[in-house]
């Protein structure tokens, strides 16, 4: 089975042993080397391909995607990011030079890390307040602590305390059968954490794509430590969007009973979303990304997917000296 992504050119391939090929100007997704066609879509309308599970991609399609900047992303059934073919960086070399310079200057690096943390805490606070969570006001203390942080250790301490308070309150918003004690990952210990991990993986992928389009290197960040193979800047950028996009989708799916406990399989010792339930999750995810709202800084209505790119470009403007500081996206 294959899912088209809301008219924005994202194709999700859910079928195990799917066969992806290029036939003329068309992407063809079939079962077992062409025996049963699952999806045909003009390649000009394909911006990204997300593969969950095992699939074969023909050399001709790989070549096309590499030449045209179409990302191919491999995820496990639990949403873990395995590998990907991403678009080549833009020609904006000055942006990357400025990015590396900021990373090497401790004061600048700390200031950027602080902006990402503040964006995360502020939006998390608004999210909890809007949803009527008890204890949302406690995040104000962590916010003040982050604002006053003078070094990375203090900043990360404030972020950690804010995250602990946030997830305690978030868990109380969930249906009783999905409540959890703390955030868990690798592997997630309960269905709600499993959905959160999945949503965060997809959000990180979106942020990585936005940064590449804007001309930045997703692997050199400021808040998250730089490690081999870790998209640190993508993880930085996604912080201000965790509650706005990922947590919002998960909360809506669970509270509206669109995803239930029966949609999870724990035969491998941890819960994971059944293949049959993936379309429900992906429809909700794409629906949220395509939702349009007013961007507070730019003063115009944009889809959330466009806002991710807008924020990446705002970061570029700051790095190049066109803005005095990076302004995180803020919900009202």
Swiss-Prot record:
Q: Per the record's keyword annotation, is Magnesium included, yes or no?
A: yes
Ranges annotated as spanning the membrane: none
Gene Ontology molecular function terms on file: DNA binding; endonuclease activity; metal ion binding
Residues binding Mn(2+) are 159, 224, 239
Q: Which domain of life is it from?
A: Bacteria
Database matches in CDD domains? Cas1_I-II-III (cd09634)
Q: Which GO terms describe its biological process?
A: defense response to virus; maintenance of CRISPR repeat elements
Q: Which Gene3D superfamilies match?
A: CRISPR-associated endonuclease Cas1, C-terminal domain, CRISPR-associated endonuclease Cas1, N-terminal domain
The EC number(s) attached to this protein equal 3.1.-.-
Identify which cofactors the protein needs according to its UniProt entry: Mg(2+); Mn(2+)
Keywords, comma-separated and alphabetical: Antiviral defense, DNA-binding, Endonuclease, Hydrolase, Magnesium, Manganese, Metal-binding, Nuclease, Plasmid
Q: Does the keyword Manganese apply?
A: yes
Top-level EC class:
hydrolase
Quaternary structure, per UniProt, is:
Homodimer, forms a heterotetramer with a Cas2 homodimer.
Checking PANTHER family in the record gives: CRISPR-ASSOCIATED ENDONUCLEASE CAS1 1
Task: State the protein's purpose.
Answer: CRISPR (clustered regularly interspaced short palindromic repeat), is an adaptive immune system that provides protection against mobile genetic elements (viruses, transposable elements and conjugative plasmids). CRISPR clusters contain spacers, sequences complementary to antecedent mobile elements, and target invading nucleic acids. CRISPR clusters are transcribed and processed into CRISPR RNA (crRNA). Acts as a dsDNA endonuclease. Involved in the integration of spacer DNA into the CRISPR cassette.
The family note in this entry says: Belongs to the CRISPR-associated endonuclease Cas1 family.
Q: What is the name of the protein in this document?
A: CRISPR-associated endonuclease Cas1 3
Native organism is: Thermus thermophilus (strain ATCC 27634 / DSM 579 / HB8)
- Lineage of the native species? Bacteria, Thermotogati, Deinococcota, Deinococci, Thermales
Q: Which gene encodes it?
A: cas1-3
